[in-house]
Amino acid sequence: MAGLMTIVTSLLFLGVCAHHIIPTGSVVIPSPCCMFFVSKRIPENRVVSYQLSSRSTCLKAGVIFTTKKGQQFCGDPKQEWVQRYMKNLDAKQKKASPRARAVAVKGPVQRYPGNQTTC
């Protein structure tokens, strides 16, 4: 009987500890940070997107580029080529916005009488 009481007490203690350890509400996940910048420029046609690393959460402010193959690298935001890549990617994103890419169907819709069903 003493063994059962020890197990129950231990489980209650673990439950109380777990309740205080597990955070409540939303958990803030820091954004990726740049530890170093690439020394060579990556060809612009391989880059598909970018995101900024925050200076408030990272030691260095940087631009994280993603390539077509999913590889990521950091660029120095002070470099001219990094600023140009960001500007060009922003322009591409603007062109690809849903409002600009609305497609209209031209011509009449054809209906085939053989496909209709009657009840």
Curated annotation (Swiss-Prot):
What is the annotated tissue distribution of the protein whose record heads this document? Activated monocytes and activated T lymphocytes.
Q: What is this protein called?
A: C-C motif chemokine 24
In this UniProt entry, which cysteines form S-S bonds? 33-58, 34-74
Could you tell me which species this protein originates from? Homo sapiens (Human)
Q: What does this protein do?
A: Chemotactic for resting T-lymphocytes, and eosinophils. Has lower chemotactic activity for neutrophils but none for monocytes and activated lymphocytes. Is a strong suppressor of colony formation by a multipotential hematopoietic progenitor cell line. Binds to CCR3.
Q: Name one GO biological process term.
A: positive regulation of angiogenesis
Key word Disulfide bond present in the record?
Answer: yes
* Posttranslational modification: N-glycosylated.
* Sugar-modified residues: 115
Sequence similarity: Belongs to the intercrine beta (chemokine CC) family.
Q: Which GO terms describe its cellular component?
A: extracellular space
Q: Which InterPro entries match?
A: Chemokine_b/g/d, Chemokine_IL8-like_dom, Interleukin_8-like_sf
> Signal sequence span per UniProt?
1-26
Instruction: Give one GO term, molecular function aspect.
Output: receptor ligand activity
Location in the cell reads: Secreted
- SMART domains (UniProt xref): SCY (SM00199)
Q: Which domain of life is it from?
A: Eukaryota
Keyword set, alphabetical order: Chemotaxis, Cytokine, Disulfide bond, Glycoprotein, Inflammatory response, Secreted, Signal
